[in-house]
Amino acid sequence: MGPEVELPAPPSAEESTKQKAAYDASSQRLEDLIRAQNPGAGAPPPVTFEALVQQFYISAMIQMGAGTQEGQRPRVDILGARNTIDLLAILAEKTKGNLTDSEDRMLQSVLFDVRMAFLELTSMINMQAMQPPVPPPPGKK
């Protein structure tokens, strides 16, 4: 690792409390505005640990080409997928012992699923890389 970077002092408890109150008020005004524009819209889903894990899962799967429309070529970001999977692993490591059984099972299942998808994708990429190049049709170079 490189040299330690000196970080600024964290905000005081009072500053954090004021900032959180302002954030909550601003979020509520935004929600009220959206509901006024679209009265039939339901409330957004609650922000939970499961929603956070699901967000990482969806990101990793999309980065590995899932959700591609039929007939379109998948857009794969294998390095981005690996980074997202590594973030999930860090989340699992840093929250170990602090999750409910349900949260832990979900996180472990998601990690298993995205790692398996990653292994399948990298296996396919390796197989393609090992195949000899297709020669051009006669008369083309």
Feature locations, PLM:
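N-terminal intrinsically disordered, low-complexity tails
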Residues: 1-23
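Long, contiguous alpha-helical segments
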Residues: 22-141
